[in-house]
Design a protein with these regions (language model features):
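Short catalytic/metal-binding and nucleic-acid-binding patches
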Residues: 1-160
Length: 160
């Protein structure tokens, strides 16, 4: 699945905003979400996960993280991002002044182990393809560290 900040605004350049995402994923893991892999880039994140109520979990994730990140941006008076989120808000979102996430989360069905491994490799390569790092495990906000034997930032399920 991919969750993207509205208009690809680079919000996840601050550790505090990424920590909100990771804390939320950790909480949902305790509630039954199995996170197999993730990568957080500056304006979106990829998650490979499984749950009996995946759509509900992702809606909870997006609602909670949007609320917490917007609160943080307001507390820090980061008006450039807040103004962009207000400007690009979808017109039909009349119940709010700001929109944080693009609509949807674009889930893809993973049918077997081979496909799962391909998807994990693909998302872990994202920061490498962008030229940010040389090896996937060098990206701090990625489960590639877990798969290379290092300690990651959140619990990852490696057995599927």
């Amino acid at each position: 699945m991919t969750c993207t900040v509205l208009h690809w605004i680079p919000v996840f350049t601050r550790p505090e905003t990424v920590n909100i995402l990771l804390d939320s994923l950790s909480f949902l893991s305790q509630e039954g979400l199995k996170v197999y892999a993730y990568v957080v880039l500056e304006n979106h994140l990829h998650i490979i996960a499984q749950s009996d109520q995946l759509e509900k979990d992702m809606l909870r994730f997006k609602a909670h993280t949007a609320r917490k990140i917007l609160m943080l941006l307001r507390e820090r008076n980061i008006h450039t991002i807040l103004d962009q989120l207000a400007f690009y808000k979808k017109a039909h979102k009349t119940d709010r002044k700001l929109q944080f996430w693009q609509e949807g989360f674009h889930p893809e069905w993973i049918s077997d182990d081979k496909m799962l491994k391909q998807k994990i490799e693909y998302i872990h390569q994202n920061p490498v393809k962008r030229g940010y790092i040389d090896k996937p495990e060098h990206w701090r906000y990625s489960s590639a560290r877990d798969y290379s034997g290092q300690d990651g930032l959140i619990e990852i399920y490696k057995q599927w």
